[in-house]
A protein has these predicted regions:
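Loop-rich catalytic cores of soluble enzymes, especially ATP-dependent carboxylate-amine ligases
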Residues: 109, 116-146, 152-291
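Long, well-ordered mid-to-C-terminal structural blocks that present hydrophobic/aromatic surfaces
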Residues: 256-338
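A very general structural signal that marks isolated residues within well-ordered alpha-helical segments
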Residues: 44, 166-168, 188, 304, ...
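Conserved phosphate-binding loops in nucleotide/dinucleotide-binding enzymes
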Residues: 92, 164-166, 170-175, 300-309
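Terminal catalytic/cofactor-binding subdomain
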Residues: 1-149, 155, 180, 194, ...
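Short beta-strand-to-loop capping motifs
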Residues: 40-43, 84-86, 163-167, 300-302
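Active-site scaffold segments
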Residues: 79, 158-162, 297
Length: 417
């Protein structure tokens, strides 16, 4: 056996401790980041999928990292993702990401392509354009539970909001309560920003992207249980999840044995001993709505049109990073958690703000967030964009998906005429 591999062999006890500590790094609150995924289309050939080489050529001359600290990656289906640098504040994150997005947009348009807002590409069949051992193994793993995984991997786009885990106190800036609040607000955030209308399973959905994700392997896509010890629960969740990728350095297939969990592997049930690298790769494949990665990663939000990605980043920050606002927001969303678990998330994906009480709660949370953003010193233009979004959609019980659906109806009527 390779000597380096032996040195890095991992026990179940070591893995449990690592996942628990790495998931929630305790510290002060205030840093903000975002990851913006964009669908990419050639307007002259809207049903085609730009090849990876064309995408690489489009961004080849951009610096890495970008001036604002962001980095560009190509996703499995040819989506482009901008991962922002870590801002010391919301204002810094938004300013830097706007500057980086301007460079990315200009480069893409100069190549004859277009970045599209929206959570799901409903026009093109799901097709993976990147051929890497990891993505090939993930696709084989997802295929075991149905076709949804390919669609999510290749045709979806989201806004991910990244905030500090929180400190080690028991207050609303402590990681225990922040984890609870992030989960409790999650279905509401999903409903507010739903932007991928479609039909699946005989139902119409506001966020088809998210319901397809929930239809994948439940052990890696559904929310962990809410307990008094989030570190312990996250370690349990991660080790109970099935392994989707087993890396190899000799060119062998990376496909994981069917049914193998991380705990099974740590107990000797895998094709070889598990290492810290394997564990980190496994953690990176888990996609619950809120994922602890040393910070909190909000993953339930569909991509928005234009610069409206700013709104979820600001809303989540305003509700989470001001202690007064966080405590009041908790009281608003607490009654929405009557059933908990998967039902709340699926209902939000299907009905958006049509669920009884959700519009009122969301509107109240927007008002709270604006107060919190003011106390956090957020610039006026960010607060105005948040307020405008709320007036256009939330207070009317609408979400961006309703606009998309209405445009499709008008287009269908025009064609029929």
């Amino acid at each position: 056996m390779n000597a380096v591999l032996i040195q890095n062999m991992l026990s179940e006890k070591e893995a449990t401790a690592y996942v628990a500590s790495a998931g929630f790094r305790a510290g002060s609150v205030g840093s903000v980041g975002t990851e913006l995924e964009w669908l990419v289309r050639d307007p002259s050939a809207p049903l085609s999928r730009p090849a990876p080489d064309r995408l690489r050529d489009a961004v080849r001359d951009l610096p890495d990292p970008l001036p604002g600290g962001g980095r560009i990656t190509i996703e499995p289906g040819g989506q482009l993702e901008l991962s922002s640098g870590v801002g010391a504040s919301l204002a810094e994150c938004v300013a830097n990401t706007r500057a980086d997005m301007a460079l990315l947009t200009a480069a893409v348009e100069a190549a004859g392509l277009r970045l599209e807002g929206g959570g799901l590409d409903m026009l093109r069949p799901a097709f993976r354009v990147l051929d890497t051992p990891r993505y090939e193994a993930l696709e084989r793993f997802n295929d075991r539970s149905g076709p949804e995984g390919r669609v999510v991997a290749c045709n979806s786009a989201s806004v991910q909001v990244c905030l500090d885990s929180g400190d080690d106190t028991d207050g609303w800036l402590g990681y225990r309560r922040r984890w609870w609040l992030a989960d409790a607000m999650g279905p509401m955030l999903l409903a507010i920003f739903a932007n991928s209308p479609g039909t699946a399973g005989g139902h119409r959905w506001r966020s088809t992207r998210q319901v397809l994700r929930f239809a994948m392997d439940a052990g890696r896509t559904r929310a962990p249980r809410m307990t008094d010890d989030p570190r312990k629960e996250w370690a349990r969740y991660a080790l109970a999840a099935k392994v989707s990728v087993v890396a190899s350095e000799d060119g062998a297939d990376w496909t994981a044995p069917e049914g193998l969990t991380m705990r099974d592997w740590l107990r000797g049930g895998g094709p070889r001993p598990a290492t810290y690298i394997d564990l980190e790769m496994h953690l990176g494949t888990l996609v619950p709505p809120v994922r602890p990665r040393g910070y909190l990663e909000f993953r339930m939000i569909d991509q928005q049109d234009g610069e409206n990605w700013v709104v979820p980043v600001a809303l989540v920050t305003g509700l989470m990073d001001d202690a007064v606002t966080a405590e009041r927001a908790a009281e608003i969303v607490r009654p929405l958690r009557s059933l908990r678990r998967n039902h709340d998330w699926v209902t939000a994906a299907r009905r958006g703000l049509g669920e009884p009480g959700l519009t009122e709660a969301a509107t109240a949370c927007f008002d709270l967030a604006l107060e919190g953003l003011d106390r956090l010193g957020a610039p006026a233009d960010i607060r105005e964009r948040v307020a405008d979004f709320a007036q256009r959609y939330t207070v009317r019980g609408r979400c961006p998906a309703d606009d998309v659906a209405a445009r499709r109806v008008r287009a269908a009527v025009a064609v029929a005429a």
